[in-house]
């Protein structure tokens, strides 16, 4: 079996460690590759490479950096389908999703920041006839990106794009579950002309993350993952006063009012729960439906959910793919059993799919529970699988209070034809990413991130680029300096 390793100093890096692990295809359980586990010596090699790369990259003009990033965008788009197929093998998601979204939206973000890079500027202000000051936005240095396994290459692009556009170097650690496409991204960056060492990839488990958060030469850590892990990463980073961005978990509400377009609302609920087989941090897993349309909503939801195609992720007709691992599949199935035991009514799904040659994969049927109560564990806890909870509500004030009754605050959505109500409700919802009569779109221009336990900082948008810089203030004296000392 092929041995995959790290990408350091513009090339594949064999590394010093003899330890390795195997990554598997979630759809059939077959091994994909053996992966080298980085040790401290490998990490030091990545750090030294990043230092050298940073000196070259940060000295280039913003226009020069922009041109190189745009070359990478062109290569990514040219190889979209090839990269999508590898992403499917790594993640188990349907090929129709990977082709349309994963590489495309990541490339969009790189292109966006390539355009923004030349706009980074400081300010100048006169103080009096003898003094003025100016500011410079300077790169932080070496930044670390720690990725998740649901959108591996997209996350690598989302994290690297603003970091590189601002003149930083990055060391990226993909999830050990999905280590392959980050290596392809590194190769593409090099092919586009990125100086050696500016984007490095180190492979491994949580120990590599600990090396990154502990290393004094890392200036910033951007992490995507589960909230509990994020707190550990943030705590470790604080010991050396690293800047952090945390994109964490959620238990997001989708609110459907009585005047909503029913077809659209059902479509959104399905996207918000079954896209990428439910392995999306922004999933709207708590679907609140007004009592007057509840029965019609549930009836249409059942009919349409049962038509979804669960199957081979490489089949273009497949709509629901495989969960990332056997362990995660077991966790999702356990949550389903807990929901049944709690008294919720299983509307559809709720089982492992094994027919049509899927017995060796990690497939769970799209699942919907009705007659749910806010206190039930499956309503409160993030499941990260294709499991939807439908809840009934009567009044606007009531549903706002219930929607906010969670430790999370990542996303929220409202479906209504009443524009005043839409804005009024969204303004009261405690969530960082909100949609009105839509769900899931996340354009490069829009900053995304969570409230409460769902994160700190933002990905995408103008403000994220600024967070990969530090401000230097320079005061200039035009006249003789007057000392208070003789």
UniProtKB/Swiss-Prot annotation:
GO terms for molecular function: betaine-aldehyde dehydrogenase (NAD+) activity; metal ion binding. Pfam families: Aldedh. K(+) 1 binds at residues 23, 90. Gene3D superfamilies: Aldehyde Dehydrogenase, Chain A, domain 1, Aldehyde Dehydrogenase, Chain A, domain 2. GO terms for biological process: glycine betaine biosynthetic process from choline. It comes from the Bacteria. K(+) 2 binds at residues 241, 452, 455. It catalyses: betaine aldehyde + NAD(+) + H2O = glycine betaine + NADH + 2 H(+). HAMAP family: BADH (MF_00804). Dimer of dimers. Belongs to the aldehyde dehydrogenase family. This is Betaine aldehyde dehydrogenase.
């Amino acid at each position: 079996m092929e041995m995959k390793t790290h990408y350091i100093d513009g090339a594949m890096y064999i590394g010093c460690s003899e330890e390795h692990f195997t990554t598997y295809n979630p759809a059939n359980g077959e091994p994909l590759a053996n992966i080298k586990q980085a040790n401290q010596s490998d990490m030091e090699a990545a750090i030294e490479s990043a230092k050298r790369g940073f000196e070259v990259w940060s000295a280039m003009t913003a226009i020069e950096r922009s041109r190189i990033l745009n070359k990478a965008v062109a290569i990514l788009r040219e190889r979209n389908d090839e990269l999508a197929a590898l992403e499917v093998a790594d993640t188990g998601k349907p090929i129709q999703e990977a082709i349309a979204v994963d590489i495309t939206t990541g490339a969009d973000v790189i292109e966006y920041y390539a355009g923004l890079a030349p706009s980074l500027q400081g300010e100048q202000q006169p103080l009096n006839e003898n003094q003025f000051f100016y500011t410079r936005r300077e790169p932080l240095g070496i930044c670390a990106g720690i990725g998740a396994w649901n959108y591996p290459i997209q996350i690598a692009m989302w994290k690297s794009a603003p970091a590189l556009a601002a003149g930083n170097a990055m060391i990226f650690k993909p999830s050990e579950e999905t280590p392959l496409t980050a290596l392809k991204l590194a190769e593409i960056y090099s092919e586009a002309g990125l100086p050696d060492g500016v984007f490095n990839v180190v492979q491994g488990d949580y120990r590599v993350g600990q090396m990154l958060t502990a290393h004094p030469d890392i200036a910033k850590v951007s992490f995507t993952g589960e909230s509990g892990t994020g707190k550990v990463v943030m705590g470790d980073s604080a010991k050396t006063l690293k800047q952090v961005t945390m994109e964490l978990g959620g238990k997001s509400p989708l609110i459907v009012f009585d005047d909503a377009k029913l077809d659209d609302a059902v479509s959104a609920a399905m996207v918000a729960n079954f896209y990428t087989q439910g392995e999306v941090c922004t999933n709207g897993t708590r679907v609140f439906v007004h009592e007057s349309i509840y029965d019609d909503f549930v009836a249409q939801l059942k009919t349409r959910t049962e038509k979804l195609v669960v199957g081979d992720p490489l089949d273009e007709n497949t709509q629901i793919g495989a969960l990332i691992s056997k362990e995660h599949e077991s966790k999702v199935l356990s949550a389903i059993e807990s929901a049944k035991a709690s008294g919720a009514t299983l509307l559809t799904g709720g089982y492992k799919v094994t027919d049509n040659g899927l017995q060796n994969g990690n497939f769970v049927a799209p699942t919907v529970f009705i007659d749910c109560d806010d206190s039930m564990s499956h309503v409160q806890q993030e499941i990260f699988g294709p499991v939807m909870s439908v809840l009934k509500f009567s009044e606007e004030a009531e549903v706002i209070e219930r929607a906010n009754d969670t430790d999370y605050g990542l996303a929220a959505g409202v479906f209504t034809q009443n524009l005043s109500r839409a804005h009024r409700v969204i303004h009261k919802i405690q969530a960082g990413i909100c949609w009105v009569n839509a769900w899931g779109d996340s354009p490069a221009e829009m900053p995304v991130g969570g409230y409460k336990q769902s994160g700190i900082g933002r990905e995408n948008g103008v403000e994220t680029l600024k967070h990969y810089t530090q401000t230097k203030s320079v005061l200039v004296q035009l006249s003789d300096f007057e000392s208070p000392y003789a």
